[in-house]
Amino acid sequence: MGGIPFRSTGCNTCRRRKVKCDEAKPECNRCIKNGHVCTGYERKRVFIHKSSEVIDDGELKLARRPKSTSGKIPDRQLTRVEPGLPRLNINAEVRSQLLASFVGGFLPSSRHLQDGKESNILKTLPELCGNSPLLDRALLSLSSAFLAKQHKDDRLLGYSTKLYNNSMEIMHGKIKSGRGLGQDVLYTTVIFQLYELIHSSPPGFMAWIAHVQGSNAIINQCSVRKKETIAEKLFHRQLKFVTLCDAVGRRKAATLYEVLTTQQRLSQGSTELEPIDELTDLLAECSALIEHVDIFIEQLPACPNGDKNDGEKLLGSCLSLEGRLHQTCLRMQEKLGTPSTGLHDVPLREDMRAHLATSLFPDPFQFASLACAESHLIYWATLIILYPLVDELLDVLGYCRNDVTPSQSCATHPPTGEQRSLDLDVTTDFTALAEHYADEICRSVMYCTQSDMNTLGAQHLLAPLSQSAQFFQVHEVAQKYRWCQGVFVLLDSLGLGIAPLLKDMVWPQYRSARLRRSLSSTGKVS
């Protein structure tokens, strides 16, 4: 009888070269001596799931047929039973490997992280496994959906969809039970939001919105600890941001966001926040100003001689927010750095490179880290939303263009000879300034979509680029709008199935506000 087959324990390079390895770690001496790259001892893991195309004798089962009236056909015979979905081993080890493959394929390489490390919601997922059957199912559906899309595996995608629907049923049962909900339920709603970004369900964009609003509906039912864990902090940050996206789209104040911000500060025992948190807090203030300005403008036709003081206060609030945005950006740049224009030989896919190369915008930006890029994108997106409000208030209050000037913005890149000063017309026209910052977001696309950025960089682009595209569309900047549409189509190949649905997405409230402004000259206050 033969013994156990020999299995080499050497490094991957020596195994491939079929030579004896001295097994020194982390790199073997033989590879170093002979000038080879030692690829280490970690074996490549391959996940194999059975499909209906490969059925062995073990899947032949007895199936009882209805009794025949003639009695000639036996009522019991072997029947081939086709599995409707792949059978995937979901034991703890395989589940953790599947999740690790998803996280590794979604997050960027360490060179794009601040100081080689950054807190991210996905990094906390492995530690959450095994504590909640609901959350485990949601995480497995998310991981398998991403990997299925990456490898074009329809069977695995079908498995993911079934698991997703099963998780939804479990969650709805927990909510309807009337009992207190744990943090795992809140986390699951956020996981579902990520799932919709990767593999959008038939309702499309509105399925993502439904999960955002579902999170908002249950947050007060979920138990809150006195001191947040890192995972709780990152999940709450994600929930705050998507709540803001929904609120800005509906042109309503993000009321829940204020509760979350207060909870976070109380749990930290400090009012000091990270730069991205400060900027999203200011975006929340902007969402409230949108609603207040809309109400003020809409009341003008019924009351042409409306209270000018209310309009003046709103204008003052907008300009105050603008100044605080610039100051926050300056503090952020002290910590994270400023953009530069030295982006050369960026590793991009050819179809991506062909579309992004354009003369519509100045040179593309380079950032010190993805956190630096994300913070600037939120800063610019907030200004795109804010400046049209200022222009509209100036119109209805009867101000001339030069009566109010914007405050000094922070530099987009270090003050060198390359620094471009804005044209005089732009610095005295708030809507033109908004277009300038929409351009800045477009200049960031190449950095966020380079090959080793994986999917996270593209995810950070979704909301800001959507604001730019909406601005270009309603202000009829056709070429720039078509360029943004092309980017959204390409983002699908980076793992964001929702992106193509955003290429034609203009919130109805945003379009009606633009139409209202074109008619606002008839409703000036005196």
Map each language-model feature to its residues.
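Hydrophobic/aromatic-rich effector regions of fungal transcription factors
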Residues: 126, 140-153, 162-204, 214-221, ...
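Alpha-helical interaction elements in eukaryotic regulators
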Residues: 24-27, 135, 156, 160-163, ...
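Central/C-terminal regulatory/activation regions of fungal transcription factors
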Residues: 107-111, 201-409, 428-439
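Charge-rich, intrinsically disordered regulatory segments
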Residues: 1-133, 160, 173
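Helix-start/N-cap signature of alpha-helical segments
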Residues: 27, 132, 156, 181-184, ...
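C-terminal region signature
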Residues: 18, 80-92, 116-118, 215, ...
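Intrinsically disordered, low-complexity transactivation/modulatory regions
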Residues: 26, 35-37, 448, 492-496
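C-terminal hydrophobic structural anchor segments
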Residues: 405-478
